[in-house]
Swiss-Prot record:
Any single Pfam family the record assigns to this protein: DUF2015
Signal peptide start and end residues: 1-23
Cross-link Glycyl lysine isopeptide (Lys-Gly) (interchain with G-Cter in ubiquitin) placement: K86
Lineage, broadest ranks: Eukaryota, Fungi, Dikarya, Ascomycota, Saccharomycotina
Similarity field: Belongs to the UPF0357 family.
Keywords: Isopeptide bond, Phosphoprotein, Signal, Ubl conjugation
UniProt cross-references to InterPro entries, sorted A to Z: DUF2015
List of residues that carry Phosphoserine: S71, S74
Domain of life of the organism encoding this protein: Eukaryota
Protein name: UPF0357 protein YCL012C
Keyword Phosphoprotein: yes
Residues forming coiled coils: none
Length: 134
């Protein structure tokens, strides 16, 4: 009788721990389930509606939770990233060992720098005049 009580108590502790863990990592778990669902759909030849240029990006890992290309984008006429940008972002991901979001940010900051713009979006040119929002 006493061992049954401890078994039930252990079960509740494990269940509560799992619930707390799921609440803490809900976005990561949701992303994993979304990716798993996509893989299952692809495995059973279920069609995922993607713009053709986004399909290649998905296969190459050029997506994230913040840059979701799996969601409804079949009517999106934009072409996504050009091939040169994709290759540069992939190189940043591999060389700096960062995820897609960070690589995209680094790529944009470098492009800003090449065009005379600071990483925060303000012009580097000392002659430039900006209005303060105070």
């Amino acid at each position: 009788m006493k061992s049954l009580f401890y078994l039930k108590l252990l079960l509740w502790v494990v269940l509560l721990s799992l619930c707390l863990l799921m609440a803490h990592r809900k976005t990561k778990v949701a992303d994993k389930f979304r990716a798993l669902r996509s893989r299952i759909q692809l495995r059973f030849n279920r069609h995922i509606r993607l713009n053709d240029s986004f399909a290649d990006d998905l296969e190459n890992g050029l997506h994230s939770r913040n840059f979701d290309i799996i969601s409804e984008n079949s009517n999106d006429v934009r072409g996504g990233l050009d091939d040169v940008s994709k290759n540069e972002i992939k190189q940043i991901m591999e060389n700096d060992n960062v995820d897609f979001d960070k690589a995209r940010l680094l790529y944009m900051e470098r492009k800003f720098g090449q065009n005379g713009i600071a990483p925060d979006g303000t012009p580097i040119d000392p002659k430039a005049f900006t209005f303060d929002s105070r």
